[in-house]
């Protein structure tokens, strides 16, 4: 018997449905690419040599349990590595699904890892130069590389961000990993924007491959402490103004951390983004400005690189900005909406319930609906109905709006709306962010500047009794009464 959060048997009795182990040798500089459905658990271990997944080295002779992933195991050394794996049915998944339980896998010698490693070495050289300069000039320190990764959807941007972060950590650096894609929950839940100093290896066995945080309890790996800004939607276009504002505020926090922490300052920043193209140049310009980006990496998009070089030619000519294009990995696969949604659900489930190694006991309780103040993000199409008629695929920029239709910058109307009469239709089965605002806060503008303390899930609202049943990751009263209702649905 194990106590949640205090270790225990991480290798329970094997499932009788587990397949016989398969062993093979992966040649050096090659990748073993595999896809594991959610209904299957892949038990993988490297028995000889060195193997890594997105820069995270697998421990020798220690099984790693993976489910619902599309990963690639890379052998960085010429001698390659020996891999052993087996599969079994994932009993945690709902039975009766028609989804396949078979894994898909193949080996490829055509990999862009050499280019990725060269990029890492260039960034490492930048960090060393920065550290040397700051040692000699402590009164006027410089910052390490602030890297912005851009590209189309399914270009491998997130994989590259993880590789660069992992390699930097191996060199004893602690870069800030910034996630600006609200679709992904990076050390947080979907619908958030986060910035996290990388102080340990990523936990590949977690639902999203990053690991746990102190907001959800103890963890096997060193828990990360992200700064979390609530966006509340899954796509930046749902409210572009709110997205840009939150990105800007996150940039302020990150740059402040760089000023105060010499180690993080020398290590720099790595920024992962949603799919952006030249139509989103206003968003890109804001990110470059907010995070003082000095390195832009474009993944497999020559046209975007050319357009950006024209747009930022003054910065490039003044050596304030460097741009580089790198190829897309042949192992990148298109993620369908159902797979993305299931990844999000697993991330939410793990936030409250933990994983196989570290199960958690979330707290279920009833609270009075009237004890809290509720705010919800405004959809751009609701604030400006003309946006509903945009052609599919077109980007929205506020520069095209008439001046008389722009709202005052201090207005909250285009960002949040207060839920004056919260009921089941507005709260039930939704994820709600707990803000860090004090109980008696009366300034609506502070909603934009606050960070997220944690999340709760509303499973049921009893309107007759004025009660709601909530799921919380901790056994305690909800510490704040100002809540942000997201559009992220979840059913236990």
UniProtKB/Swiss-Prot annotation:
One of the GO biological process terms: mRNA 3'-end processing
Gene3D superfamilies per record: Clp1, DNA binding domain, P-loop containing nucleotide triphosphate hydrolases, Pre-mRNA cleavage complex subunit Clp1, C-terminal domain
Subunit structure: Component of a pre-mRNA cleavage factor complex. Interacts directly with PCF11.
Main location, first listed in the record: nucleus
Molecular function terms, GO-annotated: ATP binding; polynucleotide 5'-hydroxyl-kinase activity
Pfam families, per database record: Clp1 (PF06807), CLP1_N (PF16573), CLP1_P (PF16575)
Name used for this protein in its record: mRNA cleavage and polyadenylation factor CLP1
Subcellular location: Nucleus
Keywords: ATP-binding, mRNA processing, Nucleotide-binding, Nucleus
Family: Belongs to the Clp1 family. Clp1 subfamily.
tRNA processing listed as a keyword: no
Residues bound to ATP: 31, 70, 154-159
SUPFAM superfamilies: P-loop containing nucleoside triphosphate hydrolases
Organism annotation: Meyerozyma guilliermondii (strain ATCC 6260 / CBS 566 / DSM 6381 / JCM 1539 / NBRC 10279 / NRRL Y-324) (Yeast)
GO cellular component terms given for this protein: mRNA cleavage factor complex
Transmembrane segments: none
Role this protein plays: Required for endonucleolytic cleavage during polyadenylation-dependent pre-mRNA 3'-end formation.
Taxonomy, superkingdom: Eukaryota
